[in-house]
């Protein structure tokens, strides 16, 4: 009986060792201040946990088509152009683009598609950022922003992938 109880306790400890370390919900707004949805960001820690930040987006009211999706340097989303968010989050001072042979910004992510009804739901993991207390944290220096661009990112052109105007923005802070 003691062996079974001990085994159960070990199993429970292992199961609990992979837990959500941090979680935040980001509301994204367009240039008119209207909500276009949310993105839930979370990370996991512990033995066997995947690294990075998990993102689950539920968006609406966007133009149909393919759009770029990036983390930007500052936790500011001042309409109408959202330039206040600064450039892409880039703690290692790399060039832009997931296809760049010299590496990419930590804030670079793949494009997503908005359907004909203006909606998009997707999940993605960015393995280059954290929600911790390090230099790659989306909470560092007062926070960052999650940005949606008007066009697709070509995944290689520096500094922003020819992704066009910034059409929606959400502040990421603790």
Describe these PLM feature segments.
Residues 18-174:
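N-terminal leader/targeting pre-sequences
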Residues 9-17:
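Bacterial N-terminal signal peptides
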